[in-house]
Protein backbone atom coordinates (compact mmCIF):
# COMPACT_ATOMS: atom_id res chain seq x y z
CA UNK A 1 0.00 0.00 0.00
CA UNK A 2 1.48 3.32 -1.06
CA UNK A 3 0.23 6.60 0.38
CA UNK A 4 -0.63 4.67 3.53
CA UNK A 5 -0.79 7.73 5.79
CA UNK A 6 -3.27 9.60 3.58
CA UNK A 7 -7.02 9.76 4.09
CA UNK A 8 -7.95 7.05 1.57
CA UNK A 9 -4.88 4.96 2.39
CA UNK A 10 -5.78 4.76 6.08
CA UNK A 11 -9.41 3.87 5.42
CA UNK A 12 -8.28 1.03 3.13
CA UNK A 13 -5.62 -0.18 5.57
CA UNK A 14 -8.18 -0.30 8.38
CA UNK A 15 -10.69 -2.22 6.25
CA UNK A 16 -8.18 -4.81 5.06
CA UNK A 17 -6.80 -5.24 8.57
CA UNK A 18 -10.30 -5.80 9.99
CA UNK A 19 -11.71 -8.00 7.23
CA UNK A 20 -8.82 -10.25 6.19
CA UNK A 21 -5.72 -12.00 7.45
CA UNK A 22 -3.48 -10.23 4.93
CA UNK A 23 -0.06 -8.91 5.89
CA UNK A 24 0.20 -5.21 5.09
CA UNK A 25 3.33 -3.45 3.88
CA UNK A 26 2.51 0.22 4.35
CA UNK A 27 4.68 2.64 2.36
CA UNK A 28 4.63 6.14 3.83
CA UNK A 29 6.92 9.08 4.53
CA UNK A 30 5.89 9.94 8.10
CA UNK A 31 4.79 7.15 10.48
CA UNK A 32 3.53 9.77 12.95
CA UNK A 33 0.65 10.49 10.55
CA UNK A 34 -0.60 6.90 10.71
CA UNK A 35 -3.49 7.27 13.16
CA UNK A 36 -6.18 4.77 12.12
CA UNK A 37 -4.17 1.54 12.40
CA UNK A 38 -1.64 0.48 15.06
CA UNK A 39 1.94 0.63 13.81
CA UNK A 40 2.93 -2.26 16.09
CA UNK A 41 0.28 -4.65 14.77
CA UNK A 42 1.85 -8.05 13.97
CA UNK A 43 0.44 -7.99 10.42
CA UNK A 44 1.74 -4.50 9.63
CA UNK A 45 5.21 -3.61 8.36
CA UNK A 46 6.17 -0.03 7.60
CA UNK A 47 8.21 1.04 4.59
CA UNK A 48 9.29 4.56 5.53
CA UNK A 49 10.48 6.61 2.58
CA UNK A 50 9.60 8.69 -0.44
CA UNK A 51 7.97 7.03 -3.43
CA UNK A 52 10.78 8.42 -5.57
CA UNK A 53 13.28 6.28 -3.61
CA UNK A 54 11.75 3.14 -5.07
CA UNK A 55 14.92 1.07 -5.29
CA UNK A 56 15.34 1.17 -1.50
CA UNK A 57 12.44 -1.25 -1.28
CA UNK A 58 13.28 -3.53 -4.20
CA UNK A 59 13.31 -6.64 -2.02
CA UNK A 60 9.95 -5.85 -0.43
CA UNK A 61 8.33 -5.00 -3.76
CA UNK A 62 9.51 -8.26 -5.28
CA UNK A 63 7.76 -10.19 -2.50
CA UNK A 64 4.23 -8.77 -2.72
CA UNK A 65 1.28 -10.35 -4.51
CA UNK A 66 -1.09 -7.36 -4.32
CA UNK A 67 -0.41 -3.63 -4.70
CA UNK A 68 -2.77 -0.79 -3.78
CA UNK A 69 -1.25 2.41 -5.11
CA UNK A 70 -2.91 5.51 -3.62
CA UNK A 71 0.12 7.83 -3.35
CA UNK A 72 0.04 10.95 -5.49
CA UNK A 73 1.49 14.45 -5.75
CA UNK A 74 0.39 17.79 -7.15
CA UNK A 75 1.36 21.45 -7.04
CA UNK A 76 4.91 21.29 -8.37
CA UNK A 77 5.00 20.08 -12.02
CA UNK A 78 8.36 18.33 -11.69
CA UNK A 79 7.41 16.52 -8.49
CA UNK A 80 4.02 15.57 -9.96
CA UNK A 81 5.76 13.97 -12.94
CA UNK A 82 8.31 12.15 -10.79
CA UNK A 83 5.76 10.76 -8.33
CA UNK A 84 2.76 10.18 -10.60
CA UNK A 85 4.57 8.77 -13.62
CA UNK A 86 8.27 7.99 -13.21
CA UNK A 87 8.03 6.37 -9.76
CA UNK A 88 5.05 4.27 -10.82
CA UNK A 89 6.95 2.88 -13.80
CA UNK A 90 9.92 2.03 -11.59
CA UNK A 91 7.71 0.38 -9.00
CA UNK A 92 6.09 -1.82 -11.65
CA UNK A 93 9.54 -2.84 -12.90
CA UNK A 94 10.49 -4.09 -9.42
CA UNK A 95 7.41 -6.29 -8.96
CA UNK A 96 7.72 -10.03 -9.58
CA UNK A 97 5.19 -10.97 -12.31
CA UNK A 98 5.22 -14.61 -11.17
CA UNK A 99 3.99 -13.59 -7.69
CA UNK A 100 1.91 -10.56 -8.52
CA UNK A 101 -1.84 -11.12 -8.69
CA UNK A 102 -3.27 -7.61 -8.82
CA UNK A 103 -2.52 -3.88 -8.83
CA UNK A 104 -5.18 -1.40 -7.72
CA UNK A 105 -4.08 1.91 -9.18
CA UNK A 106 -5.70 5.16 -8.06
CA UNK A 107 -6.31 7.73 -10.77
CA UNK A 108 -9.01 10.41 -10.96
CA UNK A 109 -12.37 10.53 -12.71
CA UNK A 110 -11.25 13.80 -14.33
CA UNK A 111 -9.22 11.91 -16.97
CA UNK A 112 -12.16 9.89 -18.37
CA UNK A 113 -15.20 10.68 -20.47
CA UNK A 114 -18.64 9.23 -19.70
CA UNK A 115 -17.78 6.08 -21.68
CA UNK A 116 -14.68 5.43 -19.51
CA UNK A 117 -12.38 6.37 -22.36
CA UNK A 118 -9.34 8.64 -21.82
CA UNK A 119 -10.34 12.28 -22.19
CA UNK A 120 -8.02 14.04 -24.70
CA UNK A 121 -8.62 17.38 -22.97
CA UNK A 122 -7.07 15.99 -19.77
CA UNK A 123 -3.69 15.76 -21.49
CA UNK A 124 -4.06 19.02 -23.38
CA UNK A 125 -5.54 21.36 -20.78
CA UNK A 126 -5.41 19.67 -17.37
CA UNK A 127 -3.39 20.79 -14.37
CA UNK A 128 0.04 19.23 -13.87
CA UNK A 129 -1.66 16.61 -11.66
CA UNK A 130 -4.36 15.76 -14.22
CA UNK A 131 -1.85 15.61 -17.08
CA UNK A 132 0.48 13.33 -15.12
CA UNK A 133 -2.40 11.00 -14.21
CA UNK A 134 -3.54 10.92 -17.84
CA UNK A 135 -0.03 10.06 -19.05
CA UNK A 136 0.36 7.33 -16.45
CA UNK A 137 -3.00 5.79 -17.37
CA UNK A 138 -2.02 5.75 -21.04
CA UNK A 139 1.24 3.97 -20.23
CA UNK A 140 -0.43 1.52 -17.85
CA UNK A 141 -2.89 0.49 -20.56
CA UNK A 142 0.09 -0.57 -22.72
CA UNK A 143 2.13 -2.15 -19.92
CA UNK A 144 2.83 -5.92 -19.86
CA UNK A 145 1.06 -6.05 -16.46
CA UNK A 146 -2.06 -4.27 -17.74
CA UNK A 147 -4.24 -7.37 -17.38
CA UNK A 148 -3.52 -7.38 -13.64
CA UNK A 149 -4.36 -3.71 -13.15
CA UNK A 150 -7.64 -2.37 -11.78
CA UNK A 151 -7.58 1.39 -12.30
CA UNK A 152 -9.99 3.11 -9.92
CA UNK A 153 -11.29 6.62 -10.54
CA UNK A 154 -12.76 8.30 -7.46
CA UNK A 155 -14.91 11.39 -7.87
CA UNK A 156 -14.83 14.04 -5.10
CA UNK A 157 -13.78 12.37 -1.83
CA UNK A 158 -15.16 13.01 1.65
CA UNK A 159 -13.42 11.50 4.66
CA UNK A 160 -12.64 12.10 8.31
CA UNK A 161 -14.53 14.81 10.21
CA UNK A 162 -14.77 18.57 9.83
CA UNK A 163 -13.74 19.05 13.47
CA UNK A 164 -10.74 16.74 13.12
CA UNK A 165 -11.87 14.32 15.84
CA UNK A 166 -11.90 11.21 13.62
CA UNK A 167 -9.00 8.74 13.85
CA UNK A 168 -8.87 9.05 10.06
CA UNK A 169 -7.31 12.07 8.36
CA UNK A 170 -9.72 14.72 7.10
CA UNK A 171 -9.93 14.85 3.31
CA UNK A 172 -9.45 18.16 1.53
CA UNK A 173 -13.12 18.18 0.53
CA UNK A 174 -14.37 17.57 4.07
CA UNK A 175 -11.93 20.15 5.38
CA UNK A 176 -13.38 22.66 2.93
CA UNK A 177 -16.87 22.33 4.41
CA UNK A 178 -15.86 24.62 7.27
CA UNK A 179 -14.99 27.39 4.81
CA UNK A 180 -18.09 26.75 2.70
CA UNK A 181 -20.29 27.04 5.79
CA UNK A 182 -19.11 30.61 6.29
CA UNK A 183 -20.77 31.57 2.98
CA UNK A 184 -24.13 29.89 3.44
CA UNK A 185 -25.68 33.26 4.31
CA UNK A 186 -25.04 34.22 0.68
CA UNK A 187 -25.31 30.84 -1.08
CA UNK A 188 -28.83 30.24 0.26
CA UNK A 189 -30.07 33.16 -1.89
CA UNK A 190 -28.58 31.80 -5.14
CA UNK A 191 -29.56 29.03 -7.55
CA UNK A 192 -27.25 27.39 -10.08
CA UNK A 193 -27.80 24.68 -12.69
CA UNK A 194 -24.91 22.33 -11.92
CA UNK A 195 -24.28 18.97 -10.28
CA UNK A 196 -21.40 16.76 -9.18
CA UNK A 197 -20.54 13.27 -7.94
CA UNK A 198 -18.86 12.36 -4.67
CA UNK A 199 -17.91 9.33 -2.60
CA UNK A 200 -16.83 8.77 0.99
CA UNK A 201 -13.41 7.27 1.72
CA UNK A 202 -15.08 4.51 3.76
CA UNK A 203 -16.95 3.38 0.64
CA UNK A 204 -13.73 3.52 -1.37
CA UNK A 205 -12.08 1.33 1.27
CA UNK A 206 -14.85 -1.27 1.10
CA UNK A 207 -14.71 -1.43 -2.71
CA UNK A 208 -10.92 -1.69 -2.81
CA UNK A 209 -10.89 -4.10 0.11
CA UNK A 210 -13.26 -6.46 -1.67
CA UNK A 211 -11.22 -6.20 -4.86
CA UNK A 212 -7.98 -6.88 -2.99
CA UNK A 213 -9.22 -9.86 -0.98
CA UNK A 214 -10.98 -11.73 -3.77
CA UNK A 215 -9.55 -13.44 -6.86
CA UNK A 216 -8.57 -10.90 -9.49
CA UNK A 217 -10.98 -10.62 -12.41
CA UNK A 218 -9.74 -9.44 -15.81
CA UNK A 219 -11.46 -6.67 -17.70
CA UNK A 220 -14.53 -7.91 -19.58
CA UNK A 221 -15.67 -4.58 -21.02
CA UNK A 222 -15.44 -4.62 -24.83
CA UNK A 223 -13.18 -2.12 -26.54
CA UNK A 224 -11.26 -1.09 -23.40
CA UNK A 225 -8.23 -3.34 -23.63
CA UNK A 226 -6.77 -5.38 -20.78
CA UNK A 227 -6.83 -2.69 -18.09
CA UNK A 228 -9.97 -2.75 -15.94
CA UNK A 229 -11.64 0.57 -15.01
CA UNK A 230 -13.85 1.28 -11.99
CA UNK A 231 -15.33 4.75 -11.44
CA UNK A 232 -16.30 5.48 -7.84
CA UNK A 233 -19.10 7.90 -7.03
CA UNK A 234 -22.66 8.35 -5.85
CA UNK A 235 -25.45 9.44 -8.17
CA UNK A 236 -25.05 13.08 -9.15
CA UNK A 237 -26.30 15.65 -6.65
CA UNK A 238 -27.21 19.19 -7.68
CA UNK A 239 -25.46 22.21 -6.22
CA UNK A 240 -28.85 23.54 -5.10
CA UNK A 241 -29.60 20.34 -3.15
CA UNK A 242 -26.12 20.49 -1.66
CA UNK A 243 -26.67 24.03 -0.38
CA UNK A 244 -30.05 22.96 1.00
CA UNK A 245 -28.44 20.07 2.89
CA UNK A 246 -25.65 22.27 4.25
CA UNK A 247 -28.18 24.86 5.42
CA UNK A 248 -30.09 22.17 7.29
CA UNK A 249 -26.83 20.86 8.79
CA UNK A 250 -25.82 24.30 10.02
CA UNK A 251 -29.30 25.43 11.03
CA UNK A 252 -29.41 28.20 8.42
CA UNK A 253 -32.85 29.13 7.07
CA UNK A 254 -33.33 28.39 3.35
CA UNK A 255 -34.65 31.35 1.33
CA UNK A 256 -36.14 31.95 -2.12
CA UNK A 257 -33.31 32.14 -4.63
CA UNK A 258 -32.29 33.88 -7.83
CA UNK A 259 -30.37 32.33 -10.75
CA UNK A 260 -26.64 32.91 -10.71
CA UNK A 261 -26.42 34.88 -13.98
CA UNK A 262 -22.95 35.68 -15.45
CA UNK A 263 -23.31 39.39 -14.68
CA UNK A 264 -24.19 38.53 -11.08
CA UNK A 265 -21.11 36.33 -10.79
CA UNK A 266 -18.92 39.22 -11.98
CA UNK A 267 -20.59 41.59 -9.54
CA UNK A 268 -20.10 39.23 -6.61
CA UNK A 269 -16.43 38.76 -7.52
CA UNK A 270 -15.87 42.52 -7.51
CA UNK A 271 -17.79 43.10 -4.28
CA UNK A 272 -16.49 40.14 -2.28
Model-derived segments and their meaning:
Residues 174-199, 210:
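A conserved pocket-lining segment of Rossmann-fold NAD(P)-dependent short-chain dehydrogenase/reductase
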Residues 217-234, 243:
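A recurrent short beta-strand within the Rossmann-like NAD(P)-dependent oxidoreductase core
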Residues 243-272:
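Terminal hydrophobic/aromatic helix or amphipathic segment near a protein terminus
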Residues 20-33:
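Conserved glycine-rich Rossmann-like NAD(P)H-binding loop of the short-chain dehydrogenase/reductase
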Residues 1-22:
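N-terminal Rossmann NAD(P)H-binding glycine-rich loop of SDR-like oxidoreductase domains
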